[in-house]
């Protein structure tokens, strides 16, 4: 059981929520603030004075006053009319994150929602009865309205849920946990709908995957250094301290650790090669820049995970209702776009190392990493696949946040496109995982071909993990299953765990 303390979620907690179903309970210390804010909204509604989101229309219809006897209908209509998402459902881990983030935001006591509504959401979450939320339909301002409307509709008994391995009507899902459809009171529908939780959940989920890919790329890159008989001198700490970028310093340290004790490296210590190609030599500089961007994105997304991104905001101590723009997901969009650049570059650099390894002139290995070339093509077309994926990533990495289309009759005239920025990270991550699996296979093949010289003790663990599932490439054979097998090792974190570097989300 995880105690959710609104405004104090940590990256390790968020990673745990993404990776497994852990039961949640609301920190009792948050109850007073939630109840006070709900009462403040009830008092405002009772007075009948115009207050946006409580007794007015929405967006361009904000100047329309709604009679007191229609306030519940207003909230129901808001939820149903905004549930317009399209496309495939969000994955269950993303929905878990989305709900946890929404609970944290509501729990800070500035949204005006009753605790019983939050507890109903927690009951569904804990029973693993999760809303079916289409992944497309949000522009990231005013918040993630469509996705959150689908989440909210479940509480009304509308829409669908995933439960017990099945997709079923929301009414059946509610019945499974002993709940009846709720009637939302003043402001509650808007409190549930308004916020950046969908884009932030998508960005966090994909960021955790990219963190694992980063650690994997350190490992595969180090293995490629040994396979190509590259030098370890470019990883000397003195070089990187003179430049001063922390990511570069940390990446170089990881390469030194991984390559420490390599017999292959010792075997060519006195060779006449002066400098390696950039894809080997400049790994700390490139991967360090990626690391700095990823750490910054993690800080931004953690802030957003703990933020109140509702509108309007209620301040119970003064009774004020303040309209602002915390729903605008520009910080999330920028963070996701920066993660996209980093993930694409990780894959691009790995593709270049694969190209180096299969080129006999550069690597000194047999052409395409196979003996008896000609009758055997070896890794020739595996590299083509890596090139195709790296190229695709370059298009996917185009920033979504540079685009904006006005909506709601120009009331919402600038939007963030954060949800698309976060969503396409998943495609980039999948491509990069496959590129890294091809590099791991190529580098392992190269290390095998350096026998009797051996790689380092740290990298031998990588060799063992790869060779447990995929044998040395002797002759041409049906190659796709080999790539798929190593991709599974990449995506389940098996290879990442062999990296000496870790992220804040893992601590």
UniProtKB/Swiss-Prot annotation:
2,3-didehydroalanine (Ser): modified positions: 142
Q: Give the record's pathway.
A: Amino-acid degradation; L-histidine degradation into L-glutamate; N-formimidoyl-L-glutamate from L-histidine: step 1/3
Q: Does the keyword Cytoplasm apply?
A: yes
Q: Please tell me which positions the record assigns to the cross-link 5-imidazolinone (Ala-Gly).
A: 141-143
Query: How would you describe the post-translational modification of this protein?
Result: Contains an active site 4-methylidene-imidazol-5-one (MIO), which is formed autocatalytically by cyclization and dehydration of residues Ala-Ser-Gly.
- What would you give as a GO molecular function for this chain, any one? histidine ammonia-lyase activity
Q: What class of enzyme is it?
A: lyase
Q: Where in the cell is it found?
A: Cytoplasm
Q: Which UniProt keywords apply?
A: Cytoplasm, Histidine metabolism, Lyase
| Its EC number(s) | 4.3.1.3
A cellular component annotation (GO) from this entry: cytoplasm
Family matches, as PROSITE patterns: PAL_HISTIDASE
The Gene Ontology biological process annotation of the record reads: L-histidine catabolic process to glutamate and formamide; L-histidine catabolic process to glutamate and formate
Which reaction is this enzyme known to catalyze? L-histidine = trans-urocanate + NH4(+)
Q: Which family does it belong to?
A: Belongs to the PAL/histidase family.
What's the protein name? Histidine ammonia-lyase
User: What organism does the record attribute this protein to?
Assistant: Paraburkholderia phytofirmans (strain DSM 17436 / LMG 22146 / PsJN)
